[in-house]
Amino acid sequence: MNVFGKKEEKQEKVYSLQNGFPYSHHPYASQYSRPDGPILLQDFHLLENIASFDRERVPERVVHAKGGGCRLEFELTDSLSDITYAAPYQNVGYKCPGLVRFSTVGGESGTPDTARDPRGVSFKFYTEWGNHDWVFNNTPVFFLRDAIKFPVFIHSQKRDPQSHLNQFQDTTIYWDYLTLNPESIHQITYMFGDRGTPASWASMNAYSGHSFIMVNKEGKDTYVQFHVLSDTGFETLTGDKAAELSGSHPDYNQAKLFTQLQNGEKPKFNCYVQTMTPEQATKFRYSVNDLTKIWPHKEFPLRKFGTITLTENVDNYFQEIEQVAFSPTNTCIPGIKPSNDSVLQARLFSYPDTQRHRLGANYQQLPVNRPRNLGCPYSKGDSQYTAEQCPFKAVNFQRDGPMSYYNFGPEPNYISSLPNQTLKFKNEDNDEVSDKFKGIVLDEVTEVSVRKQEQDQIRNEHIVDAKINQYYYVYGISPLDFEQPRALYEKVYNDEQKKLFVHNVVCHACKIKDPKVKKRVTQYFGLLNEDLGKVIAECLGVPWEPVDLEGYAKTWSIASAN
């Protein structure tokens, strides 16, 4: 499948300069003033190569730096038209090409891909209506629920600011942060089981974690969470095996997927949503906007809607995997809205912003990020996935900047009334095209529009959240935060899995340098299960001094929700 419309060239390949003209000398020969003399400034072939080499690296991702990926195909097997008017979810049998990138979260690009860490699983679907992204993880929950904590949390997962050692040598700051922010306990309980070390990228699941809101043509809201489940089932490595591979084969997962696809295998995933009405959300035991909680499947069963098939390796890692840019803003296409999840709201800004820093202001014009319906002349080729198959040409008023590949040619950069410059606007449900924003907007038209928006907002907020003013708020910790991870440890993990969980925690926490933090780790797990805390204390060689949640919060100055 040729996503980018690239023609298969059969012409001879000639070594050339960047301007396209052939270079007649040996590529390895520099130009000297005389044999064994100094090189000449006029050797522009040498200068061009050195200058290019000096600029080869772009900043690596601040998170999810280590990764790999491939091309894919999405197919809609079951319509979601009853809960959303989003175009890709309407017609059974709809297919589109795409790209997926798998990654770890905390490590740099050279770290092992079998490390105990969540896995990022990000999808980009090249639909006829534009690019649609899913930016997921392989865990259904996360370490935090307030966006303000995300930068400092990531700092704690990186290298120590003084020693510059990472958590393979020193885990003090890692556990210091987690135990002072115990809403992390659900993610930690998940991650320090063998679920934290998947056997391969093709045999692990992916979850949105966040709640999104799907809207149907009647304007009815439905909360959803996405699940992408491996067709072969979830397979894991033991902690010891993952650690061994970290040393012997740090690119294990990347190599395994590349080999699978090279050998003709096509791993498959099944796509589901959980759905929750706003009325159900009011009765739900937890907040629908809490990223540290799951929706129980008994109450909110999975509903299948599609499949994803991994189809082939990319042609060039840097061009298609390193330069690909995902964002949850691309999840929120017409028919899908973001929820009030604080972390999701912040990601809507952070993801595009970090790509502008990493790749440049025009990163969405790069071939791997360019929408099919952009109408860019450089997208044309013999592919079935070019702009000609799209229902409309995408146009906006964003112009210029560094490395602008496609600047919309003669299209005006404002709403114009000039001949042959007609610009149409689609309604929210994508059914109608009109000139509704042409000309002068009267006050009464604005007032009607604002009143309708306010009514919709008040209606939705009344159902789930009371209408609130702005205020500063610290999420407290409460017994509710331990219910789901306790059930995971006590009811889902069998005896052998519990032993492995203790082993994994102790092997990691034994690298803590500060005795106070090491002691707090035992109390942290003691809040989950007292016997668990006691066993970990014995294994770490620290006194077991159990405390209840209130005592823990007071001792370590943690905000309590009580």
Curated annotation (Swiss-Prot):
Can you state which reaction this protein catalyses?
Answer: 2 H2O2 = O2 + 2 H2O
What keywords were assigned to this record?
Cytoplasm, Heme, Hydrogen peroxide, Iron, Metal-binding, Oxidoreductase, Peroxidase
Listed binding positions for heme are Y351
Q: Where in the cell is it found?
A: Cytoplasm
Q: What is its EC number?
A: 1.11.1.6
Provide the transmembrane region boundaries: none
Q: Give the chief site where it resides.
A: cytoplasm
Highest rank taxon of the organism:
Eukaryota
From the UniProt record, which GO molecular function terms apply?
catalase activity; heme binding; metal ion binding
| Cofactor(s) required, per the database record | heme
Catalytic residues (UniProt):
H64, N137
The positions making up the signal sequence are: none
Q: Which Pfam families match?
A: Catalase, Catalase-rel
Per the record, the GO terms for biological process are:
hydrogen peroxide catabolic process; response to hydrogen peroxide; response to reactive oxygen species
Alphabetical GO CC annotations of the entry are: cytoplasm; mitochondrion; peroxisome
Q: How does it assemble?
A: Homotetramer.
User: What does this gene product do?
Assistant: Occurs in almost all aerobically respiring organisms and serves to protect cells from the toxic effects of hydrogen peroxide.
Q: What miscellaneous comment appears in this entry? A: This is one of two catalases in S.cerevisiae; the other is catalase A, which is the peroxisomal form. Present with 319 molecules/cell in log phase SD medium.
What family does this chain come from, according to its entry? Answer: Belongs to the catalase family.
Listed name of the protein: Catalase T
